[in-house]
């Protein structure tokens, strides 16, 4: 959950805050490419059960889904009598405990706000008043009443939660709290005037300014922090924030209260009162700011906003893009000095009436997008993982906060560079009266969302217009208040208590889809989030001319702190005139798309979990199973010594009377014959069912192997080769030599490093060494085709390094505890070891065995 920042709050009307039940203190960033990380704001409260995202606000929930209606006043269904009642009551206790903790924080905040009121009143009648009585009453209007209401509520609820049993009732307390919301109505009506008065008094009186800038808020009873400093402006916002939160808690309580429980009707009544209160407030004014209007005089609403990478003058810039009902505005956040309000600077805008999407033919004429070198992106990822590990170590050792902040700043800088340089999917828009613009996205899902949102608005009767400088200034100024996305999507912006995501391998079987109205050629792609952004990880085969495709294809997807899985369903385009030559320009039609959260408790079970995701009337059935990175380190020897998978390489070569296992030779031969120019060869996942079929054929030494290989998808063959090396009882470069490889690659002196690395190769058993050299030369030949297949030596080292070289189970348990640690400590070195040999001139088995110093260059 994103904490509420108390610094630099914008001057908002009370309705602004009701619409924006989330953080206003966004992290500052320089859209030209230089970010500055800031620490978490002081005085922010943590609520363990409430999501503060905009969608949790009654009004924002409806808006974020594109509808115009707020949440229905009908309360959520409670638990049926006797149905999981025990579990529901336990959840009810957890909800109440969380609410009680946040209520304590809220009361402490109200106390801090009231603390200066008495001395201010005392000086008001003296010859040198700080504030007048009228000013004091305006600023602190109804705060005392709100405090007393919540103190009484807290004092009555606390013992009930502390002495919990299944028969405890507290619905009457919430009913009474809801019945006193009239006090909040009076506070809300006065809120804008209170803020303006406080600001004017701060400007005219230094003494009051000092008081209002640092009010001391007591920490919770169990907190280590005795006090935190918060501004008066931030504390005056708290009652506004609390109104919507209390309503959300009632939803949660009803959800986990049996319908036959005595509290159920009381909670229903409290929810009805609360929702009617919110509705009455919302009806008092226009649901959007009247200051931002369209040329026709209608209210201009913000529909969507987010951070996108724009190609501007051949360089990448991070922009905050705002889609209003009639205009698309591209902005960057200005750098501001401490204490000043943040502002956006408009880079350009296009009225939606003038906005068009270029055709594939027009896009083809546009400049090609040159992707950032993959090896540099991989280096950034490894640095980020290493920094995460260092931060965790510092926290575990109770290190200095300054050291942690420095590490966080470094991590933010690397994450920002990764976010800026990784997107490659073009999103082109054109102003029919002039210039074209190009954004780069990492996800086709995201591109589709932007395109669909714009096209939906363009169906309305829109008029072209030109904004005056004043109108543009007003519109740009409104962006800060209206935005729904506050922080750049990097993991360093997450709170410590947020889930770090999953590390390991997600096995997904895409079974089938239903709901298509007419036959089409259909396929699915899978996307997962990694390092704060989404990337495409797998693609099913095309199922032709059908309304009910049955793929039943399995994929293994590596997760790196992932929290969500997206599935996109496409209709394949076979019209060559519509196919764009730009590899990143996907022109197939998206039929539907959907997203699910990767809940660790659901996916980490050993069994397959089957689910259905609905998208535009289409239902896609899939199953998934997760293997943690810790578990993936384990190598299981084959029980049958007649096969090749899971059998020692020396046993296989001796049985076959060959120097290199037959499976390695055949897979490499097939890849070089028809897959060496395949984009993403070895990086793109093959279909898991095809890989398992090939595994079974090789294990059985079936005579039809060659025929099957010639008919099989090349990515499945590449995947089979990777699987063979991964399932060896010990890695190809052996458990015994693993620590020595780690030490050798870390040497600084080139001569010492080469001597050590060649000595280590000599130390390998002959079957392992010969197979390694055979694979090495193959990977070099693949990399020679990098301009076509996009697979550099570094990419190949990233794919194969952790497979050929891994710590033994004993060693990984002895030194490392978490999946993230395993990644950051080992993978970088594993990749570097293989990359060293790939970049080395050809290595001769015969020369190695002469047992002499082996220098490739004068060092």
UniProtKB/Swiss-Prot annotation:
The keyword Phosphoprotein applies. Residues 484-613 form the C2 domain. One of its GO terms (molecular function) is GTPase activator activity. Residues 54-64 have a biased composition (Polar residues). GO terms for biological process: actin cytoskeleton organization; brain development; cell migration; establishment of localization in cell; inner ear morphogenesis; intracellular signal transduction; macrophage migration; modulation of chemical synaptic transmission. Disulfide bonds: none annotated. Residues 91-284 form the DH domain. It comes from the Eukaryota. The record marks 683 as: Arginine finger. Keywords: Cell projection, Coiled coil, GTPase activation, Guanine-nucleotide releasing factor, Phosphoprotein, Synapse. Residues 31-84 are annotated as: Disordered. Residues 647-845 form the Rho-GAP domain. PROSITE patterns: C2 (PS50004), DH_1 (PS00741), DH_2 (PS50010), PH_DOMAIN (PS50003), RHOGAP (PS50238). Pfam families: C2, PH_19, RhoGAP, RhoGEF. Coiled coil: none annotated. It is found in: Cell projection, Dendritic spine; Cell projection, Axon; Synapse. Residues 301-459 form the PH domain. Its main location: other. Expressed in brain, including the cortex, hippocampus, cerebellum, and brainstem, as well as the spinal cord (at protein level). The central Dbl homology (DH) domain functions as a guanine nucleotide exchange factor (GEF) that modulates the GTPases CDC42, RHOA and RAC1. Promotes the conversion of CDC42, RHOA and RAC1 from the GDP-bound to the GTP-bound form. The C-terminus is a Rho-GAP domain which stimulates GTP hydrolysis by RAC1, RAC2 and CDC42. The protein has a unique structure having two opposing regulatory activities toward small GTP-binding proteins. Protein with a unique structure having two opposing regulatory activities toward small GTP-binding proteins. The C-terminus is a GTPase-activating protein domain which stimulates GTP hydrolysis by RAC1, RAC2 and CDC42. Accelerates the intrinsic rate of GTP hydrolysis of RAC1 or CDC42, leading to down-regulation of the active GTP-bound form. The central Dbl homology (DH) domain functions as guanine nucleotide exchange factor (GEF) that modulates the GTPases CDC42, RHOA and RAC1. Promotes the conversion of CDC42, RHOA and RAC1 from the GDP-bound to the GTP-bound form. Interacts with DLG4. This is Active breakpoint cluster region-related protein. It comes from Rattus norvegicus (Rat).
């Amino acid at each position: 959950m994103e904490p509420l920042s108390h610094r630099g709050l914008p001057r908002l009307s009370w309705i602004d805050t009701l619409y924006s039940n989330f953080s206003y203190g966004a992290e500052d960033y320089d859209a030209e490419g230089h970010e500055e990380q800031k620490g978490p704001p002081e005085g922010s409260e943590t609520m363990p059960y409430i999501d503060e995202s905009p969608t949790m606000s009654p009004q924002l929930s409806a808006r974020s889904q594109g509808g115009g209606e707020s949440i229905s006043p009908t309360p959520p269904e409670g638990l049926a009598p006797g149905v999981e009642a025990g579990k529901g009551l336990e959840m009810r206790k957890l909800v109440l405990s969380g609410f009680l903790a946040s209520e304590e924080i809220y009361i402490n905040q109200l106390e801090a706000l009231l603390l200066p009121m008495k001395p201010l009143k005392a000086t008001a009648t003296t010859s040198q008043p700080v504030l007048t009585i009228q000013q004091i009453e305006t600023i602190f209007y109804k705060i005392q009443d709100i405090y007393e209401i919540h103190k009484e509520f807290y004092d009555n609820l606390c013992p009930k939660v502390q002495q919990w049993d299944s028969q405890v009732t507290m619905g009457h307390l919430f009913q009474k709290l809801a019945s006193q919301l009239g006090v909040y109505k009076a506070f809300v009506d006065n809120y804008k005037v209170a803020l303006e008065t406080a600001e004017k008094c701060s400007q005219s009186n230094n003494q009051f300014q000092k008081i209002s800038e640092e009010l001391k808020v007591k920490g919770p009873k169990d907190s280590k922090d005795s006090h935190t400093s918060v501004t008066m402006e931030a504390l005056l916002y708290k009652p506004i924030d609390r109104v919507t939160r209390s309503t959300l808690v009632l939803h949660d309580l009803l959800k986990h209260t049996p319908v036959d429980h005595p509290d159920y009707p009381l909670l229903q009544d409290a929810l009805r009162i609360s929702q009617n209160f919110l509705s009455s407030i919302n009806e008092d004014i226009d649901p959007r700011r009247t200051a931002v209007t369209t040329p026709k005089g209608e209210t201009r609403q913000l529909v969507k906003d987010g951070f996108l990478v724009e190609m501007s003058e051949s360089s990448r810039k991070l922009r905050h893009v705002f889609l209003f009902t009639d205009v698309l505005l591209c902005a960057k956040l200005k750098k501001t000095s401490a204490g000043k309000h943040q502002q956006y600077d408009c880079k350009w805008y296009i009225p939606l009436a003038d906005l068009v999407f270029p055709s594939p033919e027009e896009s083809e004429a546009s400049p090609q997008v040159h992707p950032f070198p993959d090896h540099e992106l991989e280096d950034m990822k490894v640095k980020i993982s290493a920094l995460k590990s260092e931060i965790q170590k510092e926290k575990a050792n109770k290190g200095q906060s300054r050291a942690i902040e420095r590490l966080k700043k470094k991590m933010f800088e690397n994450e920002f560079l990764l976010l800026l340089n990784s997107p490659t999917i073009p999103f082109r828009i054109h102003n029919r009266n002039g210039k074209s613009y190009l954004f780069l996205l990492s996800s086709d899902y995201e591109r589709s969302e932007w395109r669909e949102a714009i096209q939906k608005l363009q169906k309305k009767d829109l008029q072209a217009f030109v904004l005056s400088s004043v109108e543009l200034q007003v519109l740009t100024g409104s962006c800060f208040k209206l935005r729904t996305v506050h922080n750049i999507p990097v993991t360093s912006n997450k709170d410590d208590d947020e889930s770090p995501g999953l590390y390991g391998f997600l096995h997904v079987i895409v079974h089938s889809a239903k709901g298509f109205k007419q036959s089409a050629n259909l396929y699915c792609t899978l996307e997962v989030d990694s390092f704060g952004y989404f990337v495409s990880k797998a693609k099913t085969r095309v199922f032709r001319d059908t309304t009910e495709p049955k793929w039943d294809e399995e994929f293994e997807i590596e997760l790196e702190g992932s929290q969500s899985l997206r599935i996109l369903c496409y209709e394949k385009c076979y019209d060559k005139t519509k196919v764009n030559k730009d590899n990143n320009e996907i022109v197939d039609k998206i039929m539907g798309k959907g997203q699910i959260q990767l809940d660790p408790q659901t996916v980490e079970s050993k069994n397959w979990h089957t689910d259905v995701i609905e998208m535009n009337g289409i239902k896609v059935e899939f199953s998934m199973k997760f293997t943690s990175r810790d578990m993936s380190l384990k190598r299981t020897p084959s029980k049958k010594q007649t096969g090749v998978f899971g059998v020692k390489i020396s046993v296989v070569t001796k049985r076959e009377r060959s120097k290199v296992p037959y499976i390695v030779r055949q897979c490499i031969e097939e890849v070089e014959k028809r897959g060496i120019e395949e984009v993403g060869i070895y990086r793109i996942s093959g279909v898991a069912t095809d890989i398992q079929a090939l595994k079974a054929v090789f294990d059985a030494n079936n005579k039809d192997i060659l025929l099957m290989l010639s008919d099989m998808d090349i990515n499945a063959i590449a995947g089979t080769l990777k699987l063979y090396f991964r399932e060896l009882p010990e890695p190809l470069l052996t458990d015994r030599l693993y620590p020595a490889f780690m030490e050798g690659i870390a040497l600084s002196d080139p001569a010492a490093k080469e001597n050590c690395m060649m000595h280590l190769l000599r130390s390998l058993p002959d079957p392992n060494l010969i197979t390694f050299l055979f694979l090495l030369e193959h990977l070099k030949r693949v990399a020679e085709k990098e301009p076509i297949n996009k697979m550099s030596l570094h990419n190949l080292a990233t794919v194969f390094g952790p497979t050929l070289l891994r710590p033994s189970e004993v060693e990984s348990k002895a030194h490392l505890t978490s999946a993230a640690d395993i990644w950051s400590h080992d993978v970088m070195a594993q990749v570097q070891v293989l990359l060293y040999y790939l970049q080395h001139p050809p290595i001769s088995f015969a020369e190695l065995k002469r047992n002499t110093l082996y220098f490739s260059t004068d060092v």
